[in-house]
Swiss-Prot record:
Keywords: Disulfide bond, Lipid-binding, Signal, Transport
Lineage, opening ranks: Eukaryota, Viridiplantae, Streptophyta, Embryophyta, Tracheophyta
The protein's name: Non-specific lipid-transfer protein 3
Species the sequence originates in: Prunus dulcis
GO molecular function: lipid binding
Span of the signal peptide: 1-25
Xref: PROSITE patterns: PLANT_LTP
Paired cysteines (S-S): C33-C80, C43-C57, C58-C105, C78-C119
GO BP term, example: lipid transport
Family the entry assigns: Belongs to the plant LTP family.
Record CDD domains: nsLTP1
Function: Plant non-specific lipid-transfer proteins transfer phospholipids as well as galactolipids across membranes. May play a role in wax or cutin deposition in the cell walls of expanding epidermal cells and certain secretory tissues.
Database matches in InterPro entries: Bifun_inhib/LTP/seed_sf, Bifunc_inhib/LTP/seed_store, Plant_nsLTP
Amino acid sequence: MASSGQLLKLVCLVAVMCCMAVGGPKAMAAVSCGQVVNNLTPCINYVANGGALNPSCCTGVRSLYSLAQTTADRQSICNCLKQAVNGIPYTNANAGLAAGLPGKCGVNIPYKISPSTDCKSIK
């Protein structure tokens, strides 16, 4: 099983996908990596172990989704998260739980959640 730090990084990947569905270009990203981590920390236990989803996890997922208002925000978050998960091993079960977070939290994203996401393609 992956460590809590590794799972947090995997959960952060979900944030990228949550952020990609909100529109409008802007010159500078306003969402920090710290905000991403803070919003997704409540999701670690669920991604690590499954079971019941903590309501504060969904609050964080929805909050992060609402923070990503611009293309620059979404690309910046994507790059931050890709760096965080780079080289971190995880199981298919963990990846599946992380990928399912947006839907379980009522956030509809039209993108595949994957470490191979091309951040430059995010609009």
